[in-house]
């Protein structure tokens, strides 16, 4: 297959299109429901236990794991632009709500939703540049490159969260990610057009949503 990114307008240089999606993938990977780098400040300000904040991380991972099984169904149903913009908007709202003093069960549910949007945005970015990274679809090449993005984002998001918490306030990390999501929305609104990966839209019928809710309750 020949690599192309038809979701971009024709005036966007082809050489920078995949790099833009790598930047967007980093933006999504920097997001989290709560940031453990600022755990001490959150525990002190909210008067909660460390385990309560750690549970936010587990809830985010639960959302990512549960939503992973429907990523391709979503890709075959909605346009690339719609998936990325909706993911960015959901993460933006989750980041803002996470700075409020919500009841812990509600905060954990918010982190689940944030995790779903995080993996949706990352998957949509990386799946569109897979042929650029490895024209033969060699997963021995693709996954190491993907893991570079994931591991760098994990390390630097934790570092940034700790730096913001020490120098300013822990909420600034959430504001920073909100700015990143605005960047994603701006790129998608200004540089791309609706593009569907499939010649025919595949409906969402047949997905066991109730089973997903039960598994989520079991994991949490």
What kind of feature is each model-predicted range?
Residues 65-104:
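Conserved MFS/SLC helix-loop-helix module at the cytosolic interface between two early adjacent transmembrane helices
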Residues 112-148:
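Cytoplasmic helix-loop-helix junction between adjacent transmembrane helices
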Residues 94, 105-114:
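Paired small-residue
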Residues 42-44, 74-76, 107, 156-169:
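Interfacial helix-cap and linker-helix signal at transmembrane-aqueous boundaries
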Residues 29, 33, 99, 115-123, ...:
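Small-residue-rich segments within alpha-helical transmembrane domains of MFS-like 12-TM solute carriers
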Residues 146-192, 203-216:
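Helix-loop-helix hairpin linking two adjacent transmembrane segments in secondary transporters
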């Amino acid at each position: 297959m020949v690599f192309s990114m038809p979701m971009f307008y024709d005036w966007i240089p082809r050489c920078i299109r995949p790099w833009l999606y790598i930047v967007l993938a980093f933006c999504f990977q920097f997001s989290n429901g709560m940031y453990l780098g600022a755990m001490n400040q959150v525990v002190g300000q909210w008067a909660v236990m460390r385990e309560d904040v750690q549970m936010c991380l587990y809830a985010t991972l639960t959302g990512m794991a549960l939503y992973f099984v429907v990523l391709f169904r979503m890709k075959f149903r909605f346009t690339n632009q719609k998936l990325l913009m909706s993911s960015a908007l959901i993460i933006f709202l989750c980041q803002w709500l996470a700075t409020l003093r919500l009841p812990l069960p509600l905060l954990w549910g918010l982190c689940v939703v944030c995790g779903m949007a995080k993996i949706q945005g990352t998957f949509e970015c990386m799946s569109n540049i897979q042929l650029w990274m490895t024209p033969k679809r060699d997963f021995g090449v693709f996954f190491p490159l993907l893991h570079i993005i994931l591991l760098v984002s994990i390390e630097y998001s934790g570092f940034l969260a700790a730096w913001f918490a020490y120098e300013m306030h822990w909420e600034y990390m959430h504001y920073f990610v909100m700015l990143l999501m605005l960047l994603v929305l701006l790129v998608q609104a200004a540089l791309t057009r609706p593009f569907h990966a499939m010649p025919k839209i595949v409906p969402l019928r047949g997905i066991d949503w109730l089973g997903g809710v039960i598994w989520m309750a079991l994991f949490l």
